Amino acid sequence: ATTRCDPTLIPIAGGWFELLEGGEALRYRCPPGHIPTPLARRSCGPDGQXEPLXXXXXXXXXXXXXXXXKCRAVWCPPPQDMEHGSFWPRLPRYPPGSRLHFQCFQGFNLRGAPNRTCGEGGRWSGVTPVCDDGSGDCPAPPVXXXXXKEGSRYLLEDTVRFRCGPGLVLLGSAVRQCLEGGVWSGTEPQCRAPLSFDTPSDVAASFMASLSQSVERADSNSSHGPTEKLPRXIRVDGSAXLNVFLLXDA
């Protein structure tokens, strides 16, 4: 007999579900700005009951069972105090659609996005803004929302350290060093909430940024022409993360 999910045994608080594979599995759906927890997809057994609700606990590296599925709100983390600048409005957390505005104190120039919007996936749009006066060998390093930075010297071989607030996970380099050429080692750190995720627009923006930097760029100090395609390379150090996205055209 064909296994089918029993609709009376698989509700989700605040959302709905759709049956897949002829009723042998289901996918939970939530309103915009929310995500199904502890999982988004379930399979059903011969008796029509769905598999147990279990999610991996990062801290204990074990699975924790939940009594019922529910839709939980996704929030963007609040920024820490901006070095040599300020931002508004100041809230404990920001729902999708919220906007932040940044400005620098006198004598400092703003690099990055002066305005950022909280996306549906719990991530801020645009480039992390920093206030820089040009006095260091390296520019002021970006400090992502909810990250704290240790170190305020940006001369050659100086290092800065980053950490995230409680309940957030650091992705990227926890330690960065000012290198020759005025660049920082590693990758920009991000503090991500456990429920945040990459939306299709986030993925598209990442691809476009990568292509614009490596496919058709003109180097005034080399023999490359303005439209000559250059080799594309991916550099990942020991403390960085590499996200691989697979796109399937159905």
Curated annotation (Swiss-Prot):
Residues 3-73, 74-133, 136-193 form the Sushi domain. Disulfide bonds join C5-C44, C30-C71, C76-C118, C104-C131, C138-C178, C164-C191. Glycans are attached at N115, N221. Plasma. InterPro entries: Sushi/SCR/CCP_sf, Sushi_SCR_CCP_dom. SMART domains: CCP (SM00032). Keywords: Complement alternate pathway, Complement pathway, Disulfide bond, Glycoprotein, Hydrolase, Immunity, Innate immunity, Protease, Repeat, Secreted, Serine protease, Sushi. Required in both the classical and alternate pathways of the complement system. This is Complement factor B-like protease. It comes from Gallus gallus. The lineage of its organism: Eukaryota, Metazoa, Chordata, Craniata, Vertebrata.
